[in-house]
Amino acid sequence: MDRLKLIKNLKNSMTKIFFFMSLLSANIYAKPNIILIFVDDLGYCDSEIYGCEEIKTPNIKKLADSGVSFSAGYVTSPVCSPSRASLLTGKYQQRFGHEFLPDAVPQKKAGLPIDQITIADKLQDLGYVTGLVGKWHLGTRDEYHPLNRGFDYFYGLLTEGSDYLDPTNPDARIIYRKWRGEYPPRINSSSELWSGRDSDSIFENKEKLVEERYLTDAFTSKATSFISEHKSEPFFLYLPYTAPHGPLQTTQYYYDKYKSVKNESQRIYAAMIDALDSGIGVIIDTLEQHDLINDTLIFLISDNGGGVADYGSNFPFRLGKHTLFEGGVRVPFVM
């Protein structure tokens, strides 16, 4: 696809989004619930959306089969935080100085500029209750906190990543890669794991927590609680799972599903995506139980291409995360 055609497609997509928002503002139609699932480092061929079958993702495929799957879905950046900044503001991140990962400068000073309006701000103004469950990665100072950026509720982490579970748990299946600076923490319990952290802790609103559950499962549980609590009012749920972003960590339950995969790292990576898909299935089931499935818009997008070093597959495209080749910015996209 040449540059002019790509720009035209992006313009058409933005026109449709703003038309939809204008309908909400005009109250022409009843306000649908909106769930935006923003997964982390999911490659183009890491699910069954586009015919790849190495990792079974029946729930993601169900979303695609019952809706629309985009074969040419692009994000504006091949890395986490800039892509998130663009998604939540509807602007190219370069226009407000957020084109780099905030980790490249002193972490506490970096974040989504406070003069930028988010989709959560807009939907709050339209009468939506707004929730964020998952990864923020747009600043750790109080002025950048999700509760100050349009969200009524927050559960998750403020930074780029976290352990998924206590590595001393006998149920944990973990690969530590020294070349990536990953080493087992010197701890004896979950409370030690979480209490020794700062911004990469798990928070509920602004309270630091000790989370005993596998993190993907915990995000799913909190998301379903949010849906159930607000089933009688229009809600916007931003659900940025951390999976399958590293570190490579899973539980025995998901690990056992991939006994045929001989490479240990690939096996854990597949299990992490399985947990993600299972969580999406629980979200769908919850909507069906509350008779909300036909009143809810569900979007599933990856923040960038799969990490090749983490066994992400962007087939048939070249390379992946951190690059501007197709594999880095052409992502799974379903609605």
Spans of features found by a protein language model:
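Cationic, low-complexity basic patches in intrinsically disordered or flexible, solvent-exposed regions
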Residues: 6
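Sec-dependent signal peptide recognition
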Residues: 11-20
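Hydrophobic h-region of N-terminal signal peptides that target proteins for export
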Residues: 19-29
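Formylglycine-dependent sulfatase
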Residues: 28-335
